[in-house]
Amino acid sequence: MTTESIFITTLPMDFNSQFDNITIGLNDNETLCENWREIHHLVFHLANTCFAAGLVIPSTLNLHMLFLRGMLCLGCTFFIIWAVLFRCALDIMIWNATFLSINFMHFVYLVYKKRPIKIKKELKGIYHRMFEPLHVSPELFNRLTGQFCEIKTLAKGQTYAVEDKTSVDDRLSILLKGIMKVSYRGHFLHTISANAYIDSPEFRSTEMNRGETFQVTITADDNCVFLCWSRERLTYFLESEPFLYEIFKYLIGKDITTKLYSLNDPTLGKKRKLDTQPSLCSQLSVMEMRNSLASTNDNEDGLQNFLRGTSTTSSQRNKQQEFYNAYGVGPLSHAVFC
């Protein structure tokens, strides 16, 4: 028995007649397709043109999503007009009204996200100098500075921290305006200029060990304005924002490096900047240097020799290495912060 005979025996008795009807129907349809209907109204073609224009907008365009949603909304609107005025098709109108509502809500959301975000006048400097080059958005910056920090002032001569008295656990600050000077036992160490952390060495070195005090005195050398975070609340916030956490690690590390090199040449804090600044290992910071000074009684000669410095980079490094060897802090590493 052939395959064809098996197939015929398994079919119902009236299948052949139904199949003939279907064949005839298909032939009729093929004949009818020769009579094309007239072209739809211009509104129909405008709708499809809007859809096509929205889809071909390049994704590299900054506002391509806004243009896409706008063209989809316009296309749906034309389809609704066409369905109501020229086709009287309720289903086409309902579907396109639904699509129009969805796309319009998305369009409004995108416009809201693109709105210009205002940054406080006092904070624009540190945003443009420190955070914007690292691709921190204004919205994220406002979250960082708007919840658990405040802007404070210090008059000339007032102290931000006093050695052996002020706790390092309470705050972290960035100087917005003015100049501060850092001294140890009456000896000037370096200055802190605007757009720099005030207590970054203490913040880094006491992340694991709390309850310590400043080993230096920080005094306002001018009328100063600074941004002050609550350290505990800032730590909790950064734990929920991994991107900002890495930004803070980088900025604090860079600030510590700048402070370290300004110990040999105080003019670095005001007039000069190092193009390529080698850094310390993560365990080595200015705070450890300060603690090493505090733990040594006979350190006046070493401090004076260290602060004297020389004009060349190689001699600066030699002086620093001698200083660290003398006070038992450990070898100096010249790895670069990433």
From Swiss-Prot:
Cell compartments where the protein resides: Lateral cell membrane; Cell junction, Tight junction; Membrane
Chain intervals with Polar residues compositional bias: 307-317
Cytoplasmic topological domain residue ranges: 62-65, 113-338
Glycosylation sites recorded in the entry for this protein: 21, 29
Coiled-coil regions listed: none
Membrane topology (UniProt): Multi-pass membrane protein
Tissue-by-tissue expression: Expressed in the heart.
Transmembrane segments: 41-61, 66-86, 92-112
Region described as Disordered: spans on this chain: 296-317
GO molecular function, one term: cAMP binding
Keyword Signal carried by entry: no
GO-annotated biological processes: epithelial cell-cell adhesion; heart development; positive regulation of locomotion; positive regulation of receptor recycling; regulation of cell shape; regulation of cell-cell adhesion involved in gastrulation; regulation of GTPase activity; regulation of membrane potential
Lineage: superkingdom: Eukaryota
Pfam families: POPDC1-3 (PF04831)
Main localisation: membrane
Similarity annotation: Belongs to the popeye family.
PANTHER family attached to this UniProt entry: BLOOD VESSEL EPICARDIAL SUBSTANCE, POPEYE DOMAIN CONTAINING PROTEIN
Entry protein name: Popeye domain-containing protein 1-A
Organism in which the protein naturally occurs: Xenopus laevis (African clawed frog)
Taxonomic lineage of the native organism: Eukaryota, Metazoa, Chordata, Craniata, Vertebrata
